[in-house]
């Protein structure tokens, strides 16, 4: 796919997505390999804040991909709320996280998503997130 920095506004050291894997319908997928130098890593594990930021950037990459494909400027997005965040285990350095973002509802500039993070097909985290796009 495209260079991830072409799809999201974040820059190092806060980039929390390595690759946008594409989308079909309302579901998109992204990838992050947890590295030791990640600012959200402590004691060789990725924090809850890191997972939430990864989820938000995964949703942003979908928006970026759609807007870029239409040759339109990519809007900034902001987390409005995070609900029902659940984590069964913290990703460790070296883990390869695949995240699925499903669009639940889009109304004007507000999008409600459901996110699920996997390591080797094991679901390790999930949440719902409300995102506001700046128009």
Whereabouts are the PLM-identified features?
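Small-residue-enriched segments and motifs
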Residues: 15-18, 80, 99-101, 127
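Hydrophobic beta-strand-centered segment that forms part of the acyl-chain substrate-binding groove
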Residues: 61-98
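A conserved, well-ordered hydrophobic junction motif at loop->secondary-structure transitions
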Residues: 33-67
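Short loop/turn motifs at secondary-structure junctions and domain boundaries
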Residues: 11-12, 107
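Conserved positions in beta-strands of structured domains
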Residues: 18-21, 83, 88, 102-104
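Catalytic strand-loop segment that frames the active site of acyl-thioester-processing enzymes
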Residues: 12-47
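HotDog/MaoC-like acyl-thioester-processing domains
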Residues: 29, 61, 92-98, 102-135
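Short aromatic-glycine motifs in intrinsically disordered, low-complexity regions
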Residues: 1-11
């Amino acid at each position: 796919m495209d260079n991830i920095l072409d799809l999201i506004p974040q820059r190092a050291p806060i980039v929390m997505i390595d690759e946008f894997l594409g989308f079909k319908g309302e579901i998109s997928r992204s990838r992050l390999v947890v590295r030791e130098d990640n600012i959200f890593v402590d004691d060789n594990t990725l924090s809850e804040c890191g997972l939430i930021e990864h989820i938000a950037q995964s949703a942003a990459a979908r928006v970026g991909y759609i807007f870029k494909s239409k040759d339109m400027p990519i809007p900034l997005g902001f987390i409005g709320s995070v609900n029902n965040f659940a984590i069964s285990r913290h990703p460790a350095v070296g883990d390869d996280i695949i995240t699925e973002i499903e669009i639940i509802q889009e109304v004007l500039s507000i999008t409600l998503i459901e996110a699920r993070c996997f390591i080797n097909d094991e679901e390790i985290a999930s949440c719902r997130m409300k995102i506001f796009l700046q128009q």
